[in-house]
């Protein structure tokens, strides 16, 4: 059994790091380039009695001087001019929060520390040298006197030229009420919501009139009048899709979510645009909504699209100590028969597994987002547990379930296989199954998620139509969750759990390549492929009828392109039908490097077994691939 780690880490690190901007080529030598930085370094502070975090945050966002820190002024005089010109922005920021009598002034001071000690950190010493060479940093401080905060007085909503019985919403419905702080943003939001509510009722030409806000310095109140002109209720006219020259118009017609004579609704317009984008046939989709009705008194709509090239070809490569080099190729056509059908052919090759597979998706079968799935595969495997050669085919219907992000499928599959467990006789199987799946995805990114969660559930009854006639039920559930530990997503905690069960037949009656195994890059890192489980007398994996895996990763984004990972994986395989922690628990841990690319992170993981078995487990395992581990 080939279970020996090579010098992969030493070979792979230079390859990954060669893409980083920190290493620049020049006659074979690294060059350290320092950008010359001129001008006065400065920072911006806000202080004053009554200044809280909300005021400070708002004023720093409003300050031009704060937004242009990266462009240091040539002199203190230029900085003072910048600060003077910024005072109206500071006072405008105060008014936006309801402080209509607020004032601001500024001063500029240089910060020096003549008490540097031998205990200074490297960063402090560096700053001290910079101070000596370029001058000490400068602080621009705005001294703010907010004054009294005004509150909302009367709130009136006026409908200009009301038509078709439009009833204006109440101020409470617009989240603007007497007595609340007289801040600007809630008033602007209320004005926008007033127009949006009218449009959602069918008034397509609704628009806001002038907003009146009257300040009373004696009562410290602001009286607000919001007004809207609705125009008539509008009904949809004919729709046109321009630019889809190679797509069946009947398919696109099913993607449009309104019909002529339907009442206008802006959300339906946006959802139709997204429905066209979801076909993956167009690079752009633009909506043209005219500002007047056609001759029939309806509103015609035009969607202008730009077609994508329908074909893609690609290749991938990876490496794992326990599997060897991995290469894959794919060819894809996203408009195979002219109505958004997707056909994909994939080739996967490694020393342990070779597979050629095809997948065909026919969208909108019978109803929108109801897809017909068809697949075929030819596969050969030669692992420490078994040798297997098989051909298979399947068909299923996939559709959305109770909400966005949730899909389900139900189908039928057949696989003819010749399987030889190690040190046993070869046997043939004719497996007929009825697989059903439920998939939930509420994560924010397919290859590099930073928040949200996913849940995949599979259940499939199997029966062998050849010799043994064995029947069993195989189920598996995998859940992952992603938690941002900081607002900037610099630290991510990723957790994964995987449970599996096979009921209805003994382990020996279940085909070896349908049993559960643990160990390897997609399972318990640090252990060889399929080795984190029960072994026979020759130390070959036997597999089991149940599986439990738990994983955790702490992901740290050092820069925009470089990330580090610490991970710990654990789990076991058991002969019982229900997962059990009473079996020996296998734990692996390690670190990883991520290089972020537009197609997802390049992943290098180095794992070690915590409870290593002498003569079975290698000291270290290395994995290289694209995408996060989960």
For every predicted segment, state its role.
Residues 278, 297, 312, 418-561, ...:
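C-terminal outer-membrane beta-barrel translocator/porin domains of Gram-negative envelope proteins
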Residues 162-169, 265-456, 525-526, 530-541, ...:
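Gram-negative/organellar outer-membrane beta-barrel architecture
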Residues 226, 331, 572-576, 610-612:
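Short, solvent-exposed loop/turn segments at secondary-structure junctions
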Residues 20-54, 67-321, 330, 344-364, ...:
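Periplasmic polypeptide-binding modules associated with outer-membrane biogenesis and secretion
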Residues 276, 303, 331, 360, ...:
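Hydrophobic, well-ordered secondary-structure elements that form the walls
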Residues 582-597:
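Strand-loop-strand
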Residues 7-18:
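Bacterial N-terminal signal peptides
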Residues 235-238, 249-251, 266, 285, ...:
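Extended hydrophobic-aromatic, low-complexity segments
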């Amino acid at each position: 059994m080939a279970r020996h780690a090579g010098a992969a880490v030493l070979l792979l690190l230079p390859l990954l790091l060669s893409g980083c901007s920190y290493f620049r080529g020049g006659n074979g030598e690294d060059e350290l380039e320092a950008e010359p930085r001129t001008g006065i370094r400065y920072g911006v502070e806000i202080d004053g009695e009554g200044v809280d975090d909300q005021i400070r945050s708002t004023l720093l966002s409003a300050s031009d001087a704060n937004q242009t820190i990266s462009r240091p002024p040539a002199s203190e005089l230029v900085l003072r001019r910048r600060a003077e010109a910024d005072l109206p922005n500071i006072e405008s920021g105060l008014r936006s929060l309801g402080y209509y009598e607020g004032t601001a002034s500024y001063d500029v001071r240089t910060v020096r520390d003549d008490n540097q000690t031998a205990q200074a950190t490297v960063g402090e010493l560096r700053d001290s040298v910079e101070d000596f060479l370029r001058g000490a940093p400068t602080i621009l401080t705005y001294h703010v006197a907010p004054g009294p905060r005004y509150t909302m007085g009367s709130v009136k909503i006026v409908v200009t030229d009301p038509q078709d019985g439009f009833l204006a919403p109440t101020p409470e419905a617009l989240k603007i009420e007497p007595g609340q702080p007289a801040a600007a943003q809630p008033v602007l939001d209320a004005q926008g919501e007033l127009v949006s509510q009218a449009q959602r009722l069918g008034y397509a030409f609704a628009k806001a009139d002038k907003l009146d806000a009257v300040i009373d310095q004696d009562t410290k109140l602001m009286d607000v009048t919001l007004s809207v002109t609705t125009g008539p209720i509008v009904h949809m006219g004919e729709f046109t899709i321009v630019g889809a020259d190679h797509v069946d118009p009947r398919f696109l017609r099913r993607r449009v979510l309104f019909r002529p004579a339907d009442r206008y609704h802006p959300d339906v317009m946006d959802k139709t645009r997204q429905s066209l984008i979801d076909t993956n046939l167009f690079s752009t989709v633009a909506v043209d909504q005219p500002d007047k009705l056609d001759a029939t008194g309806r509103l015609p709509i035009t969607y202008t699209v730009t077609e994508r090239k329908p074909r893609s070809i690609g290749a991938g490569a990876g490496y794992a100590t326990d599997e060897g080099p991995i290469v894959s190729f794919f060819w894809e056509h996203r408009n195979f028969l002219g109505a958004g059908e997707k056909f994909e052919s994939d080739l996967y090759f490694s020393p342990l597994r070779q597979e050629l597979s095809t997948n065909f998706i026919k969208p909108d079968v019978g109803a929108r987002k109801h897809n017909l799935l068809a697949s075929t595969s030819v596969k050969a495997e030669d692992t420490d547990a078994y040798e297997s050669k098989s051909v298979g085919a399947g068909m299923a219907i996939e559709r959305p379930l109770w909400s966005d992000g949730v899909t389900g499928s139900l189908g039928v599959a057949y696989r003819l296989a010749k399987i030889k467990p190690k040190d046993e006789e070869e046997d043939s199987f004719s497996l007929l199954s009825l697989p059903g799946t439920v998939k939930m995805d509420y994560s924010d990114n397919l290859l590099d998620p930073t928040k949200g969660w996913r849940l995949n559930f599979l259940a499939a009854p199997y029966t062998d139509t050849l010799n043994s006639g064995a029947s069993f039920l195989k189920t598996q559930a995998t859940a992952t969750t992603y938690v941002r530990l900081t607002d900037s997503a610099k630290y991510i905690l990723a957790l994964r759990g995987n449970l599996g069960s096979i009921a209805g037949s003994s382990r020996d009656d279940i085909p070896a390549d349908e049993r559960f195994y643990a160990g390897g890059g997609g399972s318990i890192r640090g252990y060889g492929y399929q080795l984190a489980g029960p072994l026979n007398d020759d130390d070959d994996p036997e597999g089991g009828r149940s599986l439990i895996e738990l994983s955790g990763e702490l992901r740290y984004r050092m820069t925009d392109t470089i990330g580090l990972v610490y991970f710990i994986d654990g789990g076991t395989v058991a002969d019982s039908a229900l997962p059990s922690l009473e079996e020996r628990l296998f734990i692996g841990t390690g670190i990883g490097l991520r290089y972020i690319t537009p197609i997802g992170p390049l992943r290098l993981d180095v794992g070690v077994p915590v409870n290593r078995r002498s003569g079975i487990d290698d000291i270290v395992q290395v994995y290289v691939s694209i995408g996060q581990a989960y």
